[in-house]
Amino acid sequence: MGSGFSKFIFSASNKQINRAVLSDLSRLFTRNPVYYEILIFETMQKAAKESVILTENVYLESQFLQREVCIDFFFPATVSTEEPVSLLLINDGQDMEKMNFHKILDRLYSEKEIEPLLFVAIHAGEERKMEYGTQNHLDYKDRGAKAPLYTSFIFDELLPFIRQKYSIISFKEKAFAGFSLGGLSALDIVWNRPGEFTKAGIFSASLWWRSVDQNDEYYDDDKHRIMHQQIRNGKYAPWLKFFLQCGNLDEIKDRNKNGIIDSIDDTLDLIKELETKGYDRERDIYYLELADGHHDVFTWGRAMPVFLKWGWGIK
């Protein structure tokens, strides 16, 4: 890993610091502009020293998506530039601030609980339901039409950008995570590009994604849930591992009237497909079910440390 990560050094002086500090310092500016600038600089240095996580926000122009993509980068400040680093891509990156992701990482790295990772949180665009989904199959409402373009953005624009910007030739490993529809997207990309990844982390994923309306008389769970079909018809990649999280309060729908909400049913059925494909429940799959978990950022934030320690925990 090259010197590109030196660019992170003062990015700890990000939105969180600006909100907390600049309002208090602004009144000094009119009296002593030089002092004001020095004080800001010293505050930034102090914040950078206190936090073990460095951040950077960038905007990447995508030709595939025809939009500017907002991306947040998170990286542990204490990592040597010679250490191999893993990459975790995260869909719905706009939720990281609400999740207090920075604080989650601060605690995990302060307590030396996880290995070095570069976290890349990709903000969703206005056409989220078109860009996320399954790249080879539209759902019954033709949603997910831009999922192939989103996949191209990841591999042909984002990954080359990361390698160039931070002087990283190769990563120790790559993983993809996401929430709700972003979880479906992450799993779909990992499953269809297994040579690029080692892990998928899906939180309350939209595994109901189907090719036929459930109210259609011909609808059949076994035939029309798209991701389940992809796994059933796909190839076994023995190095892949899967983290799946659900909450008992994710929703109230129970389409087959078996007393189990659809979110959990769909996830457990997907695990069965993975096991049938050859994945071991103990070695390759981690299922986390939160009894009081909702379909919200707070719940996913509670599950996030479990996911990170499962995937990259220091033994």
Predicted regions and their residues:
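Positively charged N-terminal leader segments that act as targeting/secretion signals
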Residues: 1, 18-27
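Short, solvent-exposed coil/turn linker segments
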Residues: 4, 24-25, 280-281
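Aromatic (phenylalanine/tyrosine) cluster motif
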Residues: 5-10, 29, 35-36, 41
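Helix-centric, low-specificity signal for extended rod-like, repetitive segments
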Residues: 9-12, 20, 24, 288
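Ubiquitous "structural anchor" signal
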Residues: 10-12, 28, 32, 186, ...
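Intrinsic structural disorder/low-complexity segments
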Residues: 18-19, 31, 298
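Non-catalytic cap/lid and distal C-terminal segments of serine-dependent acyl enzymes
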Residues: 36-315
